[in-house]
Regions:
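Short active-site oxyanion
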Residues: 26-30, 48-49, 196-202, 252-258
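Short, solvent-exposed loop/turn segments at secondary-structure junctions
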Residues: 37-40, 56-59, 149-152, 208-211, ...
C-alpha cells in the first residue's frame, strides 16, 4: 500500500481499506473519476488497466509530471520549504496567473522555421521545447507547495508545518513507481485510453460525464468521490447542484459498476435511494483541534452488492 504524495480536501486516507474491501469481485478496467489525491488508487493493488481523472488541470499536470519527469520535479521542489505567509501569498499569486511557459510559443516556432537555417531551427526548437516542459514542471512544483503548506490542503490560506524532506521525496518516488507499475496495454486498449500508450496509469483531465462515456463497459469499475453536497465552494473546480443531479442521471445509465462516496445527508440518500447505500463513520480530521474525537458520517453508494467480495473470500477454519 502506497500513500498519496499530497493531502487533499476530502481525501480518502481513513476510508481506503473499507472501500477497497467492497470493490466488485470482477472487473478489468478501473477508473477514478474524481481522482483528487488518489488515496484509493495508491492503496489498491496495481491492475492492468487503470485511469486517474480529475477536472482540475493543476492536479492532473502534477500527476503527469510525477509519472514522467520525477527527477525534474524533485529538482524544482528544491530544499527550501515556505517559512512565511508572505512567501506563500507570493507563490499563490504567481500560480493563479498560470504564467509557466513562454508566451506566443506557436508563433515563435513558425517564424523561426521561416527565418532560421534548418540546423539553427532544430537547436532553437529543442531550446523552446525544453523550456515549455520545464514550465509544466514548475507549475507542478508550485501547486504541490501550495497544497502542502495550506490549511486543510485547500491551497488558499497559509498554514506552515514542519516538513520531513527525506519522507517527502520518498513518497514522491513511491508515487512515481506506482503510476508506472501496471501492465503494458494492447493496441485496442491504447485506443480506448484516448491515445495514451505505454505502461502505467492513464492520466486524464476531463469532466465526469465525458470520462464515464469514454470508458464505460460491462467490465469497467468506476470509483467516484465528487465534491460533497454543501461543501462545493471548498474546491477549485465549481460543482453546482445541477451537476449533482447530472451525476445521478449518468450513473443510472452506465453498463459498468460504480462505487460512489458522499457525505451522509437526506438529499443524497433520497437522490440515490434506488441503489445500495452503506453508511460509514470516521474521525473528522479537520475538526480534531477544536472537537477532539469528532466524527464525520459518510455514505458508500454502489450499483452492486458491496458485500459480494467479502462473501466470496474464503473463511478461515478453526477448531474452537
Amino acid at each position: 500500500m502506497v500513500n498519496s504524495m499530497i493531502p487533499w480536501i476530502g481525501g480518502k486516507r481513513l476510508m481506503r481499506e473499507f472501500l477497497i474491501a467492497r470493490f466488485p469481485p470482477y472487473y478489468d478496467k478501473y477508473v477514478e473519476v474524481f481522482g483528487g489525491a488518489g488515496w484509493v488508487l495508491f492503496a489498491k493493488k496495481p491492475e492492468r488497466f487503470e485511469v486517474y481523472n480529475d477536472a482540475n488541470s493543476n492536479l492532473t499536470n502534477m500527476f503527469h509530471v510525477v509519472k514522467h519527469k520525477p527527477m525534474s520535479f524533485v529538482k524544482e521542489l528544491g530544499f527550501l520549504p515556505l517559512n512565511s505567509r508572505a512567501e506563500f501569498d507570493l507563490m499563490l499569486d504567481w500560480h493563479r496567473k498560470q504564467d509557466f511557459s513562454l508566451p506566443y510559443q506557436t508563433e515563435e516556432m513558425a517564424l523561426a522555421k521561416i527565418y532560421l537555417s534548418p540546423i539553427d531551427f532544430r537547436e532553437y526548437k529543442e531550446l523552446i521545447t525544453t523550456q515549455a516542459e520545464l514550465g509544466d514542471v514548475r507549475r507542478a512544483a508550485t501547486f504541490y507547495k501550495l497544497i502542502r503548506y495550506s490549511y486543510a490542503a485547500g491551497g488558499n490560506s497559509f498554514n506552515g508545518q514542519p516538513v520531513n524532506i527525506a519522507q517527502t521525496y520518498r513518497t514522491i518516488w513511491l508515487a512515481n513507481r506506482r503510476l508506472n507499475e501496471n501492465g503494458v496495454k494492447s493496441d485496442s486498449e491504447i485506443l480506448m485510453a484516448g491515445g495514451n500508450p505505454g505502461k502505467g496509469v492513464i492520466i486524464q483531465n476531463k469532466s465526469f460525464e465525458v470520462i464515464i462515456a469514454l470508458y464505460d463497459s460491462p467490465t469497467t469499475f468506476f470509483y467516484l468521490d465528487p465534491p460533497y453536497f454543501g461543501t462545493e465552494k471548498q474546491y477549485e473546480e465549481l460543482f453546482t447542484l445541477e451537476l449533482h443531479y447530472l451525476l445521478r442521471e449518468v450513473l443510472g445509465k452506465i453498463e459498468g459498476f460504480f462505487m460512489l462516496s458522499y457525505n451522509d445527508c437526506e438529499f443524497i440518500r433520497e437522490l440515490y435511494k434506488d441503489f445500495y447505500i452503506t453508511p460509514f463513520e470516521r474521525l473528522n480530521s479537520i475538526s480534531q483541534k477544536y472537537t477532539p474525537g469528532g466524527m464525520f458520517k459518510e455514505l458508500v453508494i454502489t450499483n452492486y452488492d458491496p458485500e459480494l467480495r467479502l462473501k466470496s473470500q474464503p473463511k478461515q477454519l478453526t477448531l474452537l
